[in-house]
């Protein structure tokens, strides 16, 4: 029986189980529930407020939208206490009725301006706020792993346009490449993120489309290996985008952002109740902009509707969808000069103006991404909860352009014969996951348990084209006036359709065990299976005959164990081990598919909260070792020297070592400070030394040794400056290499590495809010720094120059 059938059966079982739970679980007849919203005096949500029932000492903390819920409360009358550091405590009477959910709304005396960065951004330490990406309600302080959450307030304060703007707030995670400006590729701890490491609301998403930041409530980063939770992911970390959710109180915001290069971006966000059991939210935006690059422009259309259904006192169903259409000019940047004829000089970045565009006046890239998801949450009781997520995603890309700017040194420096590229692809993703978590005790030992399973099914359809004239024309990137450029669109005919299916399945269990009040053990294991059934190729011009590719399958166990010592209430030390696996391409010497590479990670760290939660300092050290990196096989199956580079063996090794420092401070009311520094050393530490293998001791491309970030924002809350906000942020990426890593006995007589200098950028912001109106302005790259994002040796994209943007908003 094929795995595809098994995966389909598993997905059906997960779906059936979710439906069964929705309609068969009944509430406890002897208790009721309490829910509500907490707002500031000017109608904005108050997050992280302590909510407690005085008589039974039972409570919770309000969410980012100001909502709270307490379940399984015995029938009766109580007093609810709302408290927060620095705020006036509120005490109100409430009544609980069996089998019912009582709803109450509360308003704090302070307004949003007075509470800025305290209530909305949360004055609690980053170590006290659980991240949903971990699938368990564990505070980072008790988790032997580094976790970072970027809040909606930070995203708004910095007027983030793209996900790369948000990522600048996470030390050790950085934008590595922007190939043709079509997507953003992030790196962490020496490893590249890909679609396998990118998630939205816990479901894997394609990274080919640049996400819409205005729809995000927060962005979570779980650093290091997350294979036990998500299967085949790169060991550097994973990223989860949390979208805005429906609310049971009416409100919203309309805004208009404008800026340099004709940027115009209106946006709307509206939410409210449809009934006492159904809430909605719709946010959307349109964006139009030119560029600091000549002839480059873009248009984006985005909408994100969602519904929240209360299915009783313990269950809720969230239905979400979003659609993104992004049309823009693909741009391979400045390009390089290459000595491809003599093979004696390394590639160098072309010294041309930042604005010079090397493409045509007709080239285009159109991406369409549609997602839909259903999330079911159920509380059996206060300790046991169930989460089920089913999602569907469709991604389409239509691209036609000249590409890969690799000009020549001679005979005429800068001469480039422009090659054509055509991409026409469509991907469909079906994903499902089921998570059960609970808290219980065995004797005096407390447990927080997670057990779950997930399954993914991907189908990619790719059309290949025959383009009339593989070379479009010839230009000179150093002197555009030397040649007359073509302007017509060449004919491209479809010749084949390749369908590539991928199936993933995983089952996992982990337990956080409190051995003593100070010592906690986190242990778990996951079994993952990834299968690539045979590809099918349809020859569109040869009677539609079909050819099959080669079947491939890989499976692996991913264990995880961590020990945490809570030295004091506000200090914890931890050590952990985990591993992940990487699926390999190519064949072994017996013509079989390669097994996956197993990557081990070791981590040590300390987490501190000082000065009554006003200062948080976290320090982490890690070592990531790939002991079986796929390398070109030294000998063939007969023992003869191997000359076929597609025949490989797991004989290489890479090592990534580093440290990360995170600091967050709120010493003064209205002041928010974040800073971080990371060091990484990633090299090839073992190679077989034969032709085609990598060079021992060489640093991997796109892995800077140093990165750093920092931001400071202050909001005045009293006097004549009340409502004024000022801030600054900075980001640094150190020296790194573009190009390709060198191999033994390569054909080039020079290094294939392209050195790239480090760079730093500084942004400054200022804004003012009064009543429901706000205006915020930002000047980015204040020093007009000039540097590049380098993809291999042909997409050398300059970083943006100094730019100005401003956002005017009205909340209702």
Kindly give the residue locations of the regions a language model identified.
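Gram-negative outer-membrane beta-barrel transporters
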Residues: 649-741, 809-811
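Membrane-embedded beta-barrel scaffold of Gram-negative outer-membrane proteins
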Residues: 379-381, 385-391, 395, 399-401, ...
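Structural signature of Gram-negative outer-membrane beta-barrels, strongest in the C-terminal barrel
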Residues: 312, 427, 446-450, 454-458, ...
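Acidic, small-polar-rich N-terminal luminal/periplasmic segments of exported/outer-membrane proteins
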Residues: 44-47, 52-57, 71, 111-249, ...
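Outer-membrane beta-barrel translocator/receptor signature
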Residues: 215-217, 228-305, 311-315, 370, ...
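Acidic/polar loop-and-plug regions of large Gram-negative outer-membrane beta-barrel proteins
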Residues: 287, 291, 306-310, 314-379, ...
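C-terminal beta-signal and adjacent terminal beta-strands/loops
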Residues: 627, 731-748, 767-812
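Periplasm-facing N-terminal accessory domains of Gram-negative outer-membrane beta-barrel systems
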Residues: 3, 25-116
């Amino acid at each position: 029986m094929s795995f595809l059938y098994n995966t389909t059966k598993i997905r059906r079982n997960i779906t059936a189980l979710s439906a069964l739970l929705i309609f068969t679980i009944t509430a406890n007849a002897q208790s009721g529930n309490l829910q509500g919203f907490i707002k500031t005096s000017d109608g904005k949500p108050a997050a992280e407020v302590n909510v407690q029932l005085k008589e039974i000492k039972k409570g919770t903390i309000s969410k980012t939208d100001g909502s709270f819920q307490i379940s399984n409360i015995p029938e009766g009358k109580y007093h609810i206490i709302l408290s927060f550091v620095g705020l006036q405590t509120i005490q109100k009477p409430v009544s609980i009725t069996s089998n019912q959910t009582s709803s109450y709304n509360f308003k704090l005396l302070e307004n949003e301006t007075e509470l800025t960065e305290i209530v909305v951004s949360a004055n609690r330490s980053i170590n006290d706020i659980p991240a949903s990406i971990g699938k368990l309600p564990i505070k980072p302080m008790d988790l032997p792993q580094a976790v970072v959450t970027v809040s909606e307030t930070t995203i708004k304060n910095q007027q983030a346009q793209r996900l790369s703007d948000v990522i600048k707030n996470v030390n050790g995670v950085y934008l590595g490449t922007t190939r043709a400006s079509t997507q953003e590729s992030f790196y962490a701890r020496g490893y590249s993120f890909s679609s396998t490491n990118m998630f939205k609301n816990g479901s894997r998403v394609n990274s080919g489309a640049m996400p819409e930041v205005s729809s995000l409530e927060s962005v979570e980063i779980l650093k290091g290996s997350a294979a036990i939770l998500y299967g085949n992911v790169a060991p550097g970390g994973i990223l989860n985008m949390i979208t805005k959710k429906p609310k049971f109180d009416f409100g919203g915001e309309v805004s208009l952002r404008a800026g340099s290069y004709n940027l115009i971006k209106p946006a709307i966000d509206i939410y409210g109740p449809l009934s006492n059991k159904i809430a909605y939210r719709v946010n959307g935006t349109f964006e139009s902009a030119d560029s600091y690059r000549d002839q480059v422009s873009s248009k984006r259309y985005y909408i994100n509707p969602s519904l929240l259904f209360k299915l009783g006192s313990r269950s809720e169903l969230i239905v979400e969808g979003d659609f993104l259409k992004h049309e823009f000019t693909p741009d391979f940047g400045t390009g390089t000069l290459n000595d491809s004829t003599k093979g004696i000089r390394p590639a160098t970045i072309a010294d041309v103006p930042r604005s010079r565009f090397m493409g045509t006046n007709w080239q285009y890239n159109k991406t369409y991404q549609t997602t839909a998801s259903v999330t079911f949450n159920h509380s059996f009781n206060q300790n046991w909860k169930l989460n089920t997520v089913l999602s569907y995603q469709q991604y389409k890309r239509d691209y036609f352009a000249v590409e890969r700017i690799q000009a020549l040194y001679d005979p005429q420096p800068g001469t480039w014969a422009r090659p054509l590229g055509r991409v026409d692809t469509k991907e469909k993703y079906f994903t499902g996951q089921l998570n059960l978590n609970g808290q219980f005790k065995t004797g005096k030992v407390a447990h927080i348990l997670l057990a779950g399973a997930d399954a993914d099914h991907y189908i990619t359809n790719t059309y290949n084209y025959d383009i009339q004239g593989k070379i479009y024309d010839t230009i000179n990137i150093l002197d555009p006036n030397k040649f007359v450029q073509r302007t017509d669109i060449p004919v491209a005919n479809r010749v084949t359709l390749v369908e590539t299916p991928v199936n993933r399945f995983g089952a996992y269990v982990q337990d956080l065990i409190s051995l003593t009040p100070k010592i906690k053990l986190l242990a778990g294991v996951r079994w993952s299976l990834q299968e690539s059934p045979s590809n099918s190729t349809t020859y569109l011009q040869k009677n539609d005959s079909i050819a099959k590719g080669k079947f491939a399958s890989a499976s692996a166990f991913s264990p995880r164990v961590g020990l945490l010592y809570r030295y004091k209430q506000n200090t914890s030390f931890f050590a952990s081990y985990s591993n992940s696996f990487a699926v390999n391409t190519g064949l072994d010497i017996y013509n079989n598919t390669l097994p996956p590479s197993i990557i081990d990670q070791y981590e040590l760290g300390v987490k501190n909260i000082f000065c009554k939660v006003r200062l948080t300092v976290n320090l982490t050290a890690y070592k990531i070792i790939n002991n079986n990196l796929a390398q070109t096989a030294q000998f063939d199956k007969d023992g003869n020297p191997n000359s076929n580079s597609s025949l490989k063996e797991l004989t290489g090794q890479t090592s990534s070592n580093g440290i990360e420092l995170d600091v967050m401070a709120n010493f003064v009311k209205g002041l928010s400070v974040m800073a971080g520094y990371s060091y990484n050393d990633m090299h090839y530490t073992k190679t077989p030394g034969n032709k085609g293998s990598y060079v021992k001791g060489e640093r991997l491309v796109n892995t800077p040794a140093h990165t750093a970030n920092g931001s400071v924002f202050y909001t005045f809350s009293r006097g004549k400056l009340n409502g004024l906000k000022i801030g600054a942020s900075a980001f640094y990426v150190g020296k790194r290499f573009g190009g390709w890593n060198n191999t033994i006995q390569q054909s080039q007589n020079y290094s294939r590495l392209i050195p790239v200098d480090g760079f730093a950028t500084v942004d400054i912001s200022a804004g003012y809010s009064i009543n429901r109106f706000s205006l915020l302005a930002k000047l980015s790259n204040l020093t007009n720094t000039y540097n590049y994002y380098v993809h291999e040796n042909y997409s050398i994209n300059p970083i943006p120059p100094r730019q100005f943007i401003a956002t005017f908003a009205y909340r209702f």
